[in-house]
Amino acid sequence: MARLNELYNKEMVPQLMKDFNYRNVMEVPKLEKIVVNMGLGEAIQNVKILDSAVDEMAVITGQKPIITKAKKSIAGFKLRQGMPIGCAVTLRKDKMYEFLDRLVNVSLPRVRDFKGISGKAFDGNGNYSLGVKEQLIFPEINYDKIDKIKGLNITIVTTAKSDEEGKALLKLFGMPFRN
């Protein structure tokens, strides 16, 4: 069992039950999944960029990503329907907790001029989205082997009913929010 999962079951559930006056353990918000997405507009001209992105994401998450394709054609971007334009990974259960642990304790502190993450990126239902400008913050990525700096989106999906509950849950997991 992942370290954060154990911490959640032993310490966070009683804490959240006390803070939000839940009567039942099943009411307590929990992590459902983490979606890591990398959109690559440059993949239209150069397919090799997509291959390196898939390899990097597999190393970061520990799971093979799926290649996302364009839903419809856009002439202005020289994009045709079905062209590969990115990759995504959905993490659940132990892999999700392991990834969150590495993100909070290792990767985010490696961001340059890091002052904490914004508390305003919740969607209204307790889910949090975070943008990372470069994949180099992850220690698994070898600096010498990357061909291009790519950003990625990380969405943390919770069962929380409100942003306040979601923020309290993520704070207990150690997410470094700005004030």
From Swiss-Prot:
Name of this protein: Large ribosomal subunit protein uL5
Keyword DNA damage attributed: no
Superkingdom in the source lineage: Bacteria
Record note on quaternary structure: Part of the 50S ribosomal subunit; part of the 5S rRNA/L5/L18/L25 subcomplex. Contacts the 5S rRNA and the P site tRNA. Forms a bridge to the 30S subunit in the 70S ribosome.
InterPro entries associated with the record: Ribosomal_uL5, Ribosomal_uL5_bac-type, Ribosomal_uL5_C, Ribosomal_uL5_CS, Ribosomal_uL5_dom_sf, Ribosomal_uL5_N
Transferase listed as a keyword: no
Cellular component terms per the entry's GO annotation: ribonucleoprotein complex; ribosome
Function: This is one of the proteins that bind and probably mediate the attachment of the 5S RNA into the large ribosomal subunit, where it forms part of the central protuberance. In the 70S ribosome it contacts protein S13 of the 30S subunit (bridge B1b), connecting the 2 subunits; this bridge is implicated in subunit movement. Contacts the P site tRNA; the 5S rRNA and some of its associated proteins might help stabilize positioning of ribosome-bound tRNAs.
GO biological process entries: translation
Encoding gene (name): rplE
Organism: Geotalea uraniireducens (strain Rf4) (Geobacter uraniireducens)
The family this protein is said to belong to: Belongs to the universal ribosomal protein uL5 family.
Keywords on record: Ribonucleoprotein, Ribosomal protein, RNA-binding, rRNA-binding, tRNA-binding
GO function terms (MF aspect): rRNA binding; structural constituent of ribosome; tRNA binding
One Pfam family here: Ribosomal_L5
